[in-house]
Amino acid sequence: MFERRRIILIVLGLLVLALPGCVASYIYYPELDIRITPSSVGLAYTDVTVETSDGVNINAWWVPVKNPRATVLFCHGNGGNVSYYLETLKVFKRLGLSALIFDYRGYGRSQGKPSEQGTYLDAEAAWQYLTHERKIAPQQLIIWGRSLGGAIAARTAARHPTGLLIIESAFTSVPEVAHAHIAWLPAWVFAEYRYDTRRYVEQITMPTLIIHSSEDEIIPFAHGRKLFETLEGPKVFLAIKGSHNQGFIDSLSVYEPGIDAFIRRYAGGTNEVLAE
């Protein structure tokens, strides 16, 4: 009996030790291979290396347009790398936006291993690059995050008030979205990874656009609505259709005009639903 109990305790202990790694693999899906570059789709760009405050070199692409109406700091999702977002870069160009898109540590050509705090430091370094190296005024910046990047963008915007914030297909927090998929997992499993987007948006007063698909199969539509309801400042909700990863393409006829309209009136304070 004692031996059996000892074996059970050992197995449980090993499971507890293994859980952080399992959770990390649930959150991060990095791809190292850069499959294609902006020049492949006719976009001029500069390959940039930015050093974070903890000494990690991260890779980024600076993709300018002539006479930009604003500049985007784009925080991508948890999968792939910068080369997976060329369609998004094309959207930026059509909207007249210069952009810096960067890879989190452990993604693409960026050094290191991904972690929650690490991704925040990566976004901070990208912000510093735009405002110090490129000399772009904060009020001319749009911090834009998609999926996991929504939490990173919200946290960056909470620390650095800027012109606009766009949060697309994002969750309220990792524990809450994980519970929607794996209800039996206890909350403490995610103690190391919170990405508490809702807490960050509570601190934001700048005009913010929330974009979410009512057909999102990964992050429930309700998460986008909760983020919208949490915001205290000027805010707009843009409802689109389509899957989590393809919704912006499937809803392009609503997506681009909705973003354009938001940018045009960024100084306004209306709370509006642009589309259902």
Predicted regions and their residues:
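Short beta-strand/loop motif that positions the catalytic acidic residue
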Residues: 203-205, 210-212, 216
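Catalytic histidine neighborhood in serine/cysteine hydrolases
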Residues: 225-247
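Short alpha-helix in the alpha/beta-hydrolase fold that links the catalytic acid
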Residues: 88, 197, 206, 220-229
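Acidic catalytic loop of the alpha/beta-hydrolase fold
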Residues: 214-219, 245-246
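Membrane-embedded segments
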Residues: 53-129
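An N-terminal hydrophobic leader/cap segment in hydrolases
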Residues: 18-51, 273-275
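Post-His helix in hydrolase/transferase enzymes
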Residues: 248-262
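Primarily recognizes the serine-hydrolase "nucleophile elbow" in alpha/beta-hydrolase
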Residues: 126-133, 139-184
